[in-house]
A protein has these predicted regions:
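Short, conserved, surface-exposed binding loops centered on an aromatic residue
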Residues: 13-15
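Glycine- and charge-enriched low-complexity intrinsically disordered segments
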Residues: 2, 76-84
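Amphipathic, hydrophobic secondary-structure cores in small proteins
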Residues: 17-74, 79
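Long, charged amphipathic helices and adjacent flexible linkers at domain junctions
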Residues: 1-11
Length: 84
């Protein structure tokens, strides 16, 4: 099982491909926040960055066994604790 490196949170966008973190907080509001929650982006969910797209504008992430793309500007607002 993975171990948390520290209690400090970083933006999901700061993780490199292959790195994962536990979702702690979302600074998103409105319909986007609800949509991401419906897709599994909830407190305590394991989120892994699978790949970063050209120019870094999109991230492919795995959450609850599903890979999906999210925009960098939204990933900046999702705070995670890095996992080892």
């Amino acid at each position: 099982m993975s171990e948390v490196l520290s209690h400090s949170c970083v933006a999901l966008s700061e993780l490199s491909p292959g790195e994962a973190g536990t979702l702690h907080h979302s600074n998103l509001n409105g319909i986007l926040r609800l949509r991401l929650m419906d897709l599994g982006f909830t407190h305590g969910a394991l989120v892994e960055v699978v790949r970063k797209g050209p120019g870094g504008r999109l991230l492919a992430v795995r959450v609850r066994g599903t890979v999906m793309a999210i925009r960098h500007k939204d990933a900046v607002r999702l705070l995670v604790s890095r996992l080892r």
